[in-house]
């Protein structure tokens, strides 16, 4: 699920630095980060969200250097010693890193802005789309980052994006297109998550079907929130906990 791996950033200003998203607790990776810090003064360990490929090395690394960890909220394998809220600023050297709360991929997701650069974690990644827990929040968070008018994006996976406006516009367009496809699939008679995935995500690797189902469900909930369809939540069996009960609006093309 991590594509080419997780990106860890060492952000330096003068002699001071912070580490952003140190990653999983792998010894070789820990040694590589410490080698990169070298003679710099580590001032803190910053985390975008608590997924296991981003955060678990944060607490042990910070303990080793006697510095704080920063993040939105505790989660599996990570408990920030300083909790950040939207707009909170971290100063080190001449640099200021500003937390931007961007729920959607996860509820606890923070991006970090530094001048014209935004560190986007798993909100926007290079060369792929991301899994989304809450689509309404996710759309709002994309608008939020677009409104900052960043020049470049440095993601948690994949390559840097030097044309941020283009990358954000492509993300928003992709999500709108996906949602229109799903609404059409419901209009055409799909009544379960599996049915929607079948109709819309034809090309998906069978091993990633659970991920497609998660995204489809997030879109369906968003469509229901907008009053375009209604969902019926039953007892269900884990991966199929509900049915689409009714289409309130004819599918539009
Ligand atoms: Zn993630």
Regions found by a protein language model. Give the residues of each.
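Active-site environment of divalent metal-dependent phosphoester hydrolases
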Residues: 26-27, 50-56, 76-77, 106-109, ...
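Divalent-metal (often Zn2+) His-rich catalytic cores of metallo-beta-lactamase-fold enzymes
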Residues: 134-189
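Active-site metal-binding motif and surrounding structural segment of the metallo-beta-lactamase
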Residues: 26-70
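C-terminal regulatory/interaction regions
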Residues: 184-253
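Divalent metal-coordination and catalytic microenvironments
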Residues: 11, 21, 49, 84, ...
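Conserved beta-strand hairpin/beta-sheet module of binuclear metal-dependent hydrolase folds
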Residues: 1-39, 110-123
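Active-site neighborhood of phospho(di)ester-bond hydrolases with catalytic His/Asp-centered motifs
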Residues: 20-23, 42-51, 70-73, 99-104, ...
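Core dinuclear metal-dependent hydrolase active-site scaffold
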Residues: 10, 87-113, 118
């Amino acid at each position: 699920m991590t594509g080419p791996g997780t990106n860890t950033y060492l952000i330096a200003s003068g002699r001071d630095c912070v580490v952003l998203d140190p990653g999983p607790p792998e010894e070789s990776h820990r040694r590589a980060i410490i080698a990169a810090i070298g003679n710099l003064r580590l001032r803190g360990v910053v985390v975008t969200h608590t997924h296991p490929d981003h955060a678990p090395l944060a607490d042990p690394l910070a303990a080793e250097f006697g510095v704080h960890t920063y993040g939105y909220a505790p989660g599996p394998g990570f408990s920030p010693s300083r909790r950040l809220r939207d707009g909170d600023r971290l100063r080190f050297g001449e640099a200021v890193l500003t937390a931007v709360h961007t729920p959607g991929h996860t509820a606890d997701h923070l991006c970090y802005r530094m001048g014209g650069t935004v560190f986007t974690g798993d909100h926007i990644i290079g060369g792929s789309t991301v899994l989304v827990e809450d689509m309404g929040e996710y759309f709002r968070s994309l608008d939020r980052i677009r409104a900052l008018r960043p020049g470049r994006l440095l993601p948690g996976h994949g390559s840097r994006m030097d044309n941020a406006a283009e990358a954000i516009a492509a993300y928003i367009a992709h999500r709108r297109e996906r949602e229109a496809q799903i609404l059409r699939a419901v209009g055409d008679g799909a009544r379960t998550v599996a049915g929607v995935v079948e109709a819309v995500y034809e090309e998906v690797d069978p091993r990633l079907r659970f991920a497609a189902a998660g995204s489809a469900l997030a879109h369906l909930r968003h469509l229901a929130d907008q009053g375009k369809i209604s969902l019926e939540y039953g007892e269900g069996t884990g991966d199929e906990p509900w049915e689409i009960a009714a289409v309130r609006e004819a599918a539009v093309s």
